Amino acid sequence: MIKLFVGLGNPGAEYEATRHNAGFWWIDALSRELQAPLTLDKSYHGQVARTTLNGKTVWLLKPLTFMNVSGKSVAALARFFKIAPDEVLVAHDELDIVPGQVKLKFGGSHAGHNGLRDIHAQLGTDDYWRLRIGVGHPGVKAEVINWVLKKPSQEHRVAIEECIDRALKAVPALLAGEMEKATMLIHTSQPPRPKPPRRTEPED
């Protein structure tokens, strides 16, 4: 079962609405859903909520360390409360998924995501769960940093918010350790992928 839910992002009003903060948006939504308000806890370098569900303690964590050193916050809380890596779920922005889609994944590469990279290093393993929230790709690698640190269009923001709401429906399964069920709930609730525009033949 998942005992620690983490949302990645950067602290500060200037980053609040940027694509890189999609993980923050999700953990805020989960906090509201569980009625577990996040409060600052300097021991864990972030905002923390603790709640009890079905007799079991569940933690929510929003690192305030800046994205590139998120692992410091995650590892501090996980180690103190003896939460194993495979009991951790990290919600983060994902370039390789279009806005409006979300994927659940266990383990694997950080794929260049600096927040995940630091969590890998601090936990000493990549064996934790990720909730990959699609924010789309600018199409050019050189534009990636600028892309994630900008606000999405209104259309994309709405699509991201909708997928965040859908992913919340899998939380009971995640808490119960029913990971196959959670995966199915998340992956089968996706909207259809937009079709590319049809090519029209030039008239004679």
From Swiss-Prot:
The active site is at H20 (proton acceptor). GO terms for cellular component: cytoplasm. One of its GO terms (molecular function) is peptidyl-tRNA hydrolase activity. GO terms for biological process: protein quality control for misfolded or incompletely synthesized proteins; rescue of stalled ribosome. InterPro entries: Pept_tRNA_hydro (IPR001328), Pept_tRNA_hydro_CS (IPR018171), Pept_tRNA_hydro_sf (IPR036416). Belongs to the PTH family. Monomer. This is Peptidyl-tRNA hydrolase.
